[in-house]
């Protein structure tokens, strides 16, 4: 993503602009937005890595009902995550391209909305 673009740009690689166009086209991490995961018990999660968050169960409601439930505050927040993100992510100039990256890693440290602890960009690169 952004790291590859910045490295290509630093090296004067002619593919830098193509990389930027490609990463600009998808809007970054889309967990809980454009895709989710259903585990073997029928539980619906934002992705296959965030098993600690469950939105419902397909044995009780259809996936469509679960995924579009306007009363599920966490699911709705994930779909509008940019206004909830904290720390480095909230201030990052690349937020539109990575979308806060991987929420499961932040959740593993206790706060789904905190910065991704494995962000590969330096403080200088996010400003």
Where in this protein do the model-derived segments appear?
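C-terminal accessory region of radical SAM enzymes
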Residues: 1-18, 43-93, 99, 104
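Active-site-proximal, Lys/Arg-enriched surface segment
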Residues: 21-22
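Short, small/polar residue-rich loop motifs at catalytic or cofactor-binding pockets
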Residues: 29-32
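Short Fe-S-cluster ligation motifs
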Residues: 77-81, 115-127
């Amino acid at each position: 993503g952004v790291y590859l673009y910045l490295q290509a740009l630093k090296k004067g690689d002619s593919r830098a602009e193509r990389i930027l166009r490609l990463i600009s086209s998808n809007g970054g991490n889309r967990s809980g937005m454009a895709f989710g995961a259903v585990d073997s018990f029928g539980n619906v999660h934002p992705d296959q890595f965030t098993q600690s968050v469950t939105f419902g169960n397909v044995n009780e409601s259809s996936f469509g009902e679960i995924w579009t439930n306007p009363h599920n505050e966490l699911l709705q927040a994930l779909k509008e995550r940019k206004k909830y993100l904290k720390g480095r992510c909230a201030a990052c100039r690349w937020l539109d391209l990575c979308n806060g990256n991987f929420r499961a890693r932040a959740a593993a440290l206790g706060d789904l909305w905190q910065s991704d602890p494995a962000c590969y960009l330096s403080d200088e690169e996010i400003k």
